Amino acid sequence: IPLPGYHQVRSFMEIQAKAAPLNRSVSTLDEYLDVCWVIFQGFKKFGAVAFKDQSAYFRTLDYSNPTRDDAERVFNRLMADGLRSAGYPDELRPLDDYLFHAFLRMARDLDLPVQLHTGHLAGLSGALRKAHAAPRADLFLLHRDVRFELFHANWPHGGELLFLAKAFPNVVMNFCWAHAIDPIYCQALMREAVSAVPHAKVHAFGADYGGFGLPPGGGYVDRAWAHLQLALDNMAI
């Protein structure tokens, strides 16, 4: 379930578009939260196994904990003018951050893990501080009943990932994509992980390629298979 599109809503029209699959319209923050809850339940019913948040491509992951009043003020401003769009990221941030926390509580209630993009960013999308997992420790502590998976082996910050997976019962490490990014890093990190972290919290393989539709937007099952071969070879060395 792709989370950013639901908590980074910037305009009246974006919000209404999220409610359209239910043939509903939205005028209040409560109505929007209810729409998202119904949609997320539907995702799970039809086979979704996790939430995924790749917000690191667009912002730093230092989510504040704004009040509902602050978030509702931004939301109501968008509702007051169908042509208005909130400035990003600063003007939108109270709503963005509030919704993110609300959706984590929904993930808890649906008993679905939350996958967070950490570490390397594809392309030139870059600032190191955007995707580093270590500053997220407060988030893992606040939402202790939510299961988090930290993606891409937090490359290149392996030590911090080991600490988070060992120190927080609700955090697991996931090597998806990492075997293609840096095989030697993965070998070294795995050696440390098997001696320092409970084995059930180490997911040694994953490939988060889209599997739906036709290329270029999806249909990448072959790439997931290829990544599996890389991971198998890499872990066998």
Regions found by a protein language model. Give the residues of each.
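Aromatic/hydrophobic pocket-lining residues that form the small-molecule binding cavity
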Residues: C36, D96, F100, C186
